């Protein structure tokens, strides 16, 4: 898959699970695939039993996750995803990609503005964006090629963009099964 340009994040919604244990489980099962580029944590679901919308990730937690991930592949990264910057590690940056999954933004310009703030907040670290939610379909539904059109707008506006992810919820709207 990697030779075809497909790259895969092993992402979890950890709830109460121990994240280092999940890193081990995921890498032992899937880490041998050459398309795997890292491990991801959807922070909205990190210790949601303790804090609504997930517990903020501490610097120590982020550093431990990166070390655990890199114990399998030295070049792999850790993706941390949320729409609130305050849920991200306050200062640790090495080996992290910060992904914003905001939705319900109403227009492409509002999306670019929202995501630009995220990019600036975490610059020069790499950032990514998850988009294509049904709540934004009124803005992307009329585009000729929504993943490309939105992606190009984000890359043009946010120089530290590394990852662009279309959500699975509307993937068949864009790429219908044959």
At which residue positions do the language-model features occur?
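An active-site-proximal structural segment forming one wall of the substrate-binding cleft
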Residues: 1-4, 15-38, 68
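Aromatic-lined carbohydrate-recognition surfaces of secreted/lumenal glycan-active proteins
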Residues: 4-20, 66-88, 101, 126-136
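Short, well-ordered coil/turn segments that N-cap beta-strands
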Residues: 4-8, 33-37, 74-78, 94-95, ...
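Alpha-helix N-cap and loop-to-helix initiation/capping positions
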Residues: 17-18, 53-61, 110, 146
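Substrate-binding cleft/loops of secretory-pathway carbohydrate-active enzymes
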Residues: 22-28, 84-111
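A general structural detector for well-ordered alpha-helical segments in enzyme core domains, enriched
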Residues: 22-29, 58-65, 69, 114-118, ...
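Active-site groove signature of glycoside hydrolases
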Residues: 27-56
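Substrate-binding cleft of secreted/luminal carbohydrate-active enzymes
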Residues: 103-178
